[in-house]
C-alpha cells in the first residue's frame, strides 16, 4: 500500500476552521480544537436564529400594530378582523411601518376597517 501524507489536506482543513473563527476571543480563535467547537456552535446558532428572526420580527410588528390600534380605540385582533372583512390586504410589516412613520395614514386604515363591520 502506498503511503499517504496528509500534510496539505490537514493544514487546509484547519486553516479553513481558523479562518471562520477569526474575531473570536482568546484561544477560541487560535487553537484548532477550541476554535472548531466554537465555529460549530456559532454555525448552529446562526442556523437556529435565521429561523427565529422571522418569528421575532412578526412579534415586534404585532406589538407595534396593537399599540397603534389601541391608540385609535381598537384592539389588534379587532383591527385584523375588520381589515379582512373590508378586503384591506396590507401585511403586518407594512402596517407596523405605517403606524410608526405615518400615524395619520394608519388612523385612516383603522377608520376604513371599522366602517366595514
UniProtKB/Swiss-Prot annotation:
Regions that span the bilayer: none
SUPFAM superfamilies, alphabetized? Ribosomal protein L20
InterPro entries the UniProt entry points to: Ribosomal_bL20, RIBOSOMAL_L20_CS, Ribosomal_protein_bL20_C
Q: Which UniProt keywords apply?
A: Ribonucleoprotein, Ribosomal protein, RNA-binding, rRNA-binding
One GO-annotated biological process of the protein: translation
Q: Which Pfam families match?
A: Ribosomal_L20 (PF00453)
What GO annotations for molecular function exist for this entry?
Answer: rRNA binding; structural constituent of ribosome
This protein's GO cellular component annotations are: ribonucleoprotein complex; ribosome
Q: Which family does it belong to?
A: Belongs to the bacterial ribosomal protein bL20 family.
Q: What does this protein do?
A: Binds directly to 23S ribosomal RNA and is necessary for the in vitro assembly process of the 50S ribosomal subunit. It is not involved in the protein synthesizing functions of that subunit.
NCBIfam families reported for this sequence: rplT_bact
Write down what this protein is called: Large ribosomal subunit protein bL20
Query: Which organism's genome codes for this protein?
Result: Crocosphaera subtropica (strain ATCC 51142 / BH68)
Amino acid at each position: 500500500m502506498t503511503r499517504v501524507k496528509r500534510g496539505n489536506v490537514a493544514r487546509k482543513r484547519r486553516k479553513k476552521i481558523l479562518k471562520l473563527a477569526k474575531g473570536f476571543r482568546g484561544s477560541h480563535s487560535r487553537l484548532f480544537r477550541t476554535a472548531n467547537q466554537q465555529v460549530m456552535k456559532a454555525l448552529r446558532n446562526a442556523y437556529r436564529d435565521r429561523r427565529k428572526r422571522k418569528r421575532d420580527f412578526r412579534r415586534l410588528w404585532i406589538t407595534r400594530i396593537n399599540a397603534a390600534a389601541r391608540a385609535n380605540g381598537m384592539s389588534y385582533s379587532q383591527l385584523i378582523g375588520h381589515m379582512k372583512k373590508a378586503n384591506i390586504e396590507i401585511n403586518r410589516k407594512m402596517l407596523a411601518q405605517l403606524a410608526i412613520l405615518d400615524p395619520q395614514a394608519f388612523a385612516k386604515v383603522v377608520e376604513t376597517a371599522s366602517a366595514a363591520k
